[in-house]
């Protein structure tokens, strides 16, 4: 094996990453995103696919993003996501049409709600991505 020097190699502590949009999105702000088959981010329509993170407010004009534009994606820590329905503090959260909803058995989870929220309110979420166990 070749000799390697890892001096200067660091763990990236950034809360966000920059990804390429796989589709045009009218308003990406505070929506949950997933990767498409090309490795670009798109709105997560439901909880059936692994979640990349959520947009922490980007886009040019009112959150509008064109296919190929750069999108900021928050991948860890705590953030605010638009709610797609009523969510209670402590519930596991997944995506429905890009918005946060209560996760069902087998769904991919973006995290746990740290606040209550009604539909179209912001819900505070501690990001902790995993797949919820299927019902037995």
Model regions and ranges:
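Surface-exposed, low-hydrophobicity beta-strand/loop segments enriched in small/polar/acidic residues
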Residues: 1-136
């Amino acid at each position: 094996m070749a000799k390697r020097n890892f001096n200067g190699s660091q763990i990236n502590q950034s809360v966000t990453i920059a990804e390429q949009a796989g589709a045009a999105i009218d308003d990406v702000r505070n929506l949950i995103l997933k990767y498409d088959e090309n490795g670009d981010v798109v709105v997560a329509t439901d909880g059936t696919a692994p979640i990349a993170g959520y947009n922490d407010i980007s886009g040019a004009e009112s959150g509008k993003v064109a296919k190929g534009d750069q999108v900021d994606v928050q991948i860890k820590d705590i953030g605010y996501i638009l709610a797609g329905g009523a969510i209670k503090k402590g519930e596991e959260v997944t995506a429905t049409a890009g918005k946060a909803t209560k996760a069902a058995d087998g769904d991919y989870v973006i995290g746990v709600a740290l606040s209550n929220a009604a539909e179209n309110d912001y819900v505070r979420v501690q990001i902790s991505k995993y797949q919820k166990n299927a019902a037995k």
